[in-house]
Amino acid sequence: MENIISIVKKDLKEIAQKFNISKDPIVEINKNNIDSHFSTTLALMSAKELKQNPIQLAENIKNELLQKDYYDQIEIAGPGFINIKLKTELLSTTIKNITTLKEAYGKNKIKNKIINIEYVSANPTGFLHVGHARNAVTGSVLEEVLKFDGYEVQTEFYTNDAGNQINILAVTVFVHYLWALGIETEKPANTYGGTFYDDLANIMIQKYGDKFKNLTFTETAISDEETHQIFRKEAVQHFLTEIKQQLKDFGVVIDHYSSEQEMYDTNQIEKLLKEYKEKNATYEADGALWLKTTEFGDDKDRVLVKKDGSLTYIVPDLATHNIRIQRTHADVLINIWGGDHHGYIPRMRAGLQLLGHNPDILEIEMVQMVRLIKDGKEYKMSKRKGTAVWLVDIMEMVGKDALRYMLASKSSSSHMDLDLDLVQQKNATNPVYYAQYATARCHSILNQADQKNIKANLNVSNLLSNKKEVELLLTLDNFNQVIQMSAKNRAPQLICEYIQTVCKQFHSYYADTKILDENDVPTSEARLGLVLSVLQVLTNAFNIIGVSALETM
């Protein structure tokens, strides 16, 4: 079933082809003109190309449109804007489309393209913090948007379990282990903070007793190498399990977890360096091994292996991306990264191109910092201590739905202030409450209709005609366009913006209109169909962002 705006676009595209216009028509809901539904700038955009007067070209387009079945009135405004008014029966097909397709409404056809998204990828050194939460929401909502737009989507979590931070983690847990045994010792300044290390320390005592109590430690190592490896392995496994559970509680399930350590254990790093050498993509200088990234747009060549034989950060990153491309057969790789990675992108693309991959396969979406505000001040406290505000604490404070909604509501590329007091208010100033109240209101109306034995009419052609009904119908019809725009621009926040638009229009409509009128049952039945449509579209949108469409408040 085609939505209305797609029909208008298709008709205009046919006319454009007839007039040898190369540009694709842009069609928008006409919010400023109560006498028309859509507007297009096709004539204005194309007049110069065709060397025609834009008003005359607009008249020609108008005459072509009026030969179609769907258009009631076409007006030319200003220098060549075309305002389009539809026949009422076409408008009303929106309700039939929505109530027939239900949870599939807004979905696009299967595209036979695979997109692989890597997101969160937190170091397994502790709990998830609010920055990880924003990354998780950005990735999971984008995943659902892309699925809705017809893509096959795979998701990845890259586990940084091989670096020096894991050595520091092992020492951190070992110190807490000694403390739990009643042994007083000073914790190195570089180790991690948080009371959740006590939980793991107690688990280690249950499993191993006090057999390690006489060992010593430095900032990065336990004195016995075998014990050090035990603490590394146990800590990574513990916190990775914890991370998976916290993500699940937050509405995020990731398909595949890859391991940096596993790449070393299976000689993938050596294979990568060998492949670069075979492709003549490396050279030695100043005792180091360099990658020729300047050949493909980087501002300088990059060191792969330093003088002391140690690897630079880019080596495992290039290796995991090479493996990911080969394993997933994805058409596009999207990485959701922190904003501090921006300068890293050109060297990654160049490194992939030197392996023979299309550099455009890699897309990077940046997630900027989120600052929590409480009582008008920045909120930094956490009952689990440490240096961050933990996801589990914020969820306990405001709830999963409120946190997901607010984090999804702003572009991830901009810094964000999240007011914890605002999201707990039960009034229209709270966007989450305002949105969820709309679905609860729909359910309330449907329950009242049941009590009054009023049934929805989904086939009306002329009973939904007041300005606010038409406005709602056009906005509901536009859901698929919002999905396409959100997917194309990798902009999940557009879904929240759309939800707010629908809710604002619906609440305004409810305030001004007697939806259930026992003295006018036919109109009530038609309006009930509109309420069902609002509920379905909002439910679909809420499902995309992973927020509950509440039945009651």
Curated annotation (Swiss-Prot):
Short motif 'HIGH' region, span: 122-132
Pfam families reported in the protein's UniProt record: Arg_tRNA_synt_N, DALR_1, tRNA-synt_1d
Name of the gene this protein is made from: argS
Broad enzyme group: ligase
Name under which the protein is recorded: Arginine--tRNA ligase
Domain of life: Bacteria
Quaternary state and interactors: Monomer.
EC annotation from Swiss-Prot or TrEMBL: 6.1.1.19
Originating organism: Mesoplasma florum (strain ATCC 33453 / NBRC 100688 / NCTC 11704 / L1) (Acholeplasma florum)
Catalytic activity: tRNA(Arg) + L-arginine + ATP = L-arginyl-tRNA(Arg) + AMP + diphosphate
Protein family according to the UniProt entry: Belongs to the class-I aminoacyl-tRNA synthetase family.
Entries under Gene3D superfamilies matching the protein: Arginyl tRNA synthetase N-terminal domain (3.30.1360.70), HUPs (3.40.50.620), Isoleucyl-tRNA Synthetase, Domain 1 (1.10.730.10)
One GO BP: arginyl-tRNA aminoacylation
Nucleotide-binding found in the keyword field: yes
Keywords: Aminoacyl-tRNA synthetase, ATP-binding, Cytoplasm, Ligase, Nucleotide-binding, Protein biosynthesis
Gene Ontology CC: cytoplasm
